[in-house]
């Protein structure tokens, strides 16, 4: 469910040494399955353990996950990176905003999942997002851009060279292409 790198495990062990005996870590999602989902890591003292919590054993500590957060933390990774700028703990949970869909789920659900878990996190760096409006009988995904992508001069490139290539690669033979249904209005919100 959750992968914790060796460096992150060492970091947690060091932090937990300063806590009361029996303290572990808890990984959780606030507002799971929504666009406002946020992940977090906290200390979990013994008196805060719920009988329904999942216990994931690691070297020197356990990671506890509540049953509501668990399906949204599938494929989550925690890493601890040190560089010239300092140290940083990263938690990546690609399914926090949307549960992972089955490989045999309807195409529209699988496309939506890829947009939410892979495409939108990249667009979010520019304040943008994309949503699936419809899937046509001709196997075209009709998309709508929002935020910083609306009116951006690079939107055609993003659509054809980024999103379309990625979706066609993931769904060969099931999808023929993508089209933009956005009425673009250039403004201060536009990224480029």
From Swiss-Prot:
<keyword id="KW-0479">Metal-binding</keyword>
<feature type="binding site">
    <location>
        <position position="152"/>
    </location>
    <ligand>
        <name>[4Fe-4S] cluster</name>
    </ligand>
</feature>
<dbReference type="InterPro" id="IPR035903">
    <property type="entry name" value="HesB-like_dom_sf"/>
</dbReference>
<keyword id="KW-0004">4Fe-4S</keyword>
<keyword id="KW-0411">Iron-sulfur</keyword>
<comment type="function">
    <text>Involved in iron-sulfur cluster biogenesis. Binds a 4Fe-4S cluster, can transfer this cluster to apoproteins, and thereby intervenes in the maturation of Fe/S proteins. Could also act as a scaffold/chaperone for damaged Fe/S proteins.</text>
</comment>
<feature type="binding site">
    <location>
        <position position="149"/>
    </location>
    <ligand>
        <name>[4Fe-4S] cluster</name>
    </ligand>
</feature>
<comment type="subunit">
    <text>Homodimer.</text>
</comment>
<dbReference type="Pfam" id="PF01521">
    <property type="entry name" value="Fe-S_biosyn"/>
</dbReference>
<protein>
    <recommendedName>
        <fullName>Fe/S biogenesis protein NfuA</fullName>
    </recommendedName>
</protein>
<dbReference type="GO" id="GO:0051604">
    <property type="term" value="P:protein maturation"/>
</dbReference>
<comment type="similarity">
    <text>Belongs to the NfuA family.</text>
</comment>
<dbReference type="InterPro" id="IPR000361">
    <property type="entry name" value="FeS_biogenesis"/>
</dbReference>
<dbReference type="InterPro" id="IPR034904">
    <property type="entry name" value="FSCA_dom_sf"/>
</dbReference>
<dbReference type="InterPro" id="IPR017726">
    <property type="entry name" value="Fe/S_biogenesis_protein_NfuA"/>
</dbReference>
<dbReference type="InterPro" id="IPR001075">
    <property type="entry name" value="NIF_FeS_clus_asmbl_NifU_C"/>
</dbReference>
<dbReference type="GO" id="GO:0005506">
    <property type="term" value="F:iron ion binding"/>
</dbReference>
<dbReference type="GO" id="GO:0016226">
    <property type="term" value="P:iron-sulfur cluster assembly"/>
</dbReference>
<dbReference type="GO" id="GO:0051539">
    <property type="term" value="F:4 iron, 4 sulfur cluster binding"/>
</dbReference>
<dbReference type="Pfam" id="PF01106">
    <property type="entry name" value="NifU"/>
</dbReference>
<keyword id="KW-0408">Iron</keyword>
């Amino acid at each position: 469910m959750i992968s914790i790198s060796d460096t992150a495990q060492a970091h947690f062990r060091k932090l937990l040494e300063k806590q009361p005996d029996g303290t572990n870590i808890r990984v959780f999602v606030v507002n799971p399955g929504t666009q406002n989902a946020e992940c977090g890591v906290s200390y979990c003292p013994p008196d805060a353990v719920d009988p329904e919590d999942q216990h994931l054993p690691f070297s020197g500590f356990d990671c506890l996950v509540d049953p509501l957060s668990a399906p949204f933390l599938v494929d989550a990774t925690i890493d601890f990176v040190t560089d010239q700028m300092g140290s940083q703990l990263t938690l990546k949970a690609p399914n926090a905003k949307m549960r992972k869909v089955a490989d045999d789920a309807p195409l529209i659900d699988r496309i939506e999942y890829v947009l939410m878990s892979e495409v939108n996190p990249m667009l979010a760096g520019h304040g943008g997002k994309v949503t699936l409006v419809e899937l046509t009988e001709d196997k075209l995904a009709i998309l709508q851009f929002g935020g910083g992508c609306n009116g951006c001069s690079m939107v055609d490139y993003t659509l054809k060279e980024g999103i379309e290539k990625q979706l066609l690669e993931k769904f060969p033979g099931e999808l023929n292409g993508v089209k933009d249904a956005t009425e673009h209005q250039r403004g201060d919100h536009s990224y480029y």
